Swiss-Prot record:
This is 7-cyano-7-deazaguanine synthase. Belongs to the QueC family. GO terms for biological process: queuosine biosynthetic process. GO terms for molecular function: ATP binding; ligase activity, forming carbon-nitrogen bonds; zinc ion binding. ATP binds at I9, S10, G11, G12, M13, D14, S15, A16, L17, S18, A19. Zn(2+) binds at C188, C196, C199, C202. PANTHER family: 7-CYANO-7-DEAZAGUANINE SYNTHASE. It comes from Sulfurovum sp. (strain NBC37-1).
Length: 222
């Protein structure tokens, strides 16, 4: 039997590349997507399905986590909080979803244990990102310890973060090199028809393409 990896795929560029790297490393892909009440859930799900098909994933999970809307406290899940469009600022932005990656990784670990998967792949980026605390490498390493303490003795899961120290321009270049369908990825926090171009995530993406010297294949409003 070949080795298996659960890949958390949001539909964005980073997670699509992370999953492609897992495939390149010889893992059988178990694709995992979360609908957590985010503003662009429909577009993200559409992109996830296209990416999963391109990866020829052996299994695909679409998990609904409606409780994130009940918790709120994030511009991504609470429509009473505006998505910032003024550029990146210091500190943790209002687009941070409380403990999202911790919850995602816990569910991914349960699926990995079910399938006997050796690895979880997550496309967190620490250096060139929005500054979310649950994207830090040190945090993910501690989650790996907790997961392996809280699962069966024979379960040994490694959480892989292949992009954690890359800049967005390097992610763009690597994605093109590996043939990731960037036209089927979505980064915008607030629009589903054409990307807004002004939220933090759009700015980071556009800057990455600009520095890489490549045109972004998706449509933008401005």
């Amino acid at each position: 039997m070949g080795k298996k990896a659960v890949c958390i795929i949001s539909g964005g560029m980073d997670s699509a590349l992370s999953a492609k790297i897992a495939q390149e490393e010889g893992y059988e892909i178990i694709a995992l997507h979360f609908n957590y009440g985010q503003r662009t859930r429909n577009k993200e799900l559409e992109c996830f399905r296209k990416i999963t098909q391109e990866l020829n994933a052996s299994e695909s999970y679409e998990i609904d986590l409606d409780f994130f809307e009940q918790i709120g406290a994030s511009a991504l899940t609470d429509k009473s909080i505006d998505v910032p469009i003024g550029g990146l600022e210091e500190g943790v932005p209002v687009t941070y979803v409380p403990f999202r990656n911790g919850i995602f990784l816990s569910i991914a670990a349960a699926i990995a244990e079910k399938h006997g998967a050796e690895a979880l792949f997550i496309g967190v980026v620490e250096e060139d990102s929005s500054g979310y605390p649950d994207c830090r490498e040190s945090y993910i390493e501690q989650m790996q310890k907790a997961i392996n303490l809280g699962t069966k003795d024979e379960t040994n899961i490694e959480i892989k973060m292949p992009l954690v120290s890359l800049r967005k321009s390097q992610i763009v270049q690597k994605a093109i090199e590996l043939g990731v369908p960037l036209e089927d990825t979505w980064s915008c926090y607030q629009a589903e028809d054409a990307a807004c171009g002004v939220c933090d995530s759009c700015r980071l993406r556009l800057r990455g393409f600009e520095v890489a010297g490549v045109k972004d294949p998706i449509a933008y409003r401005k």
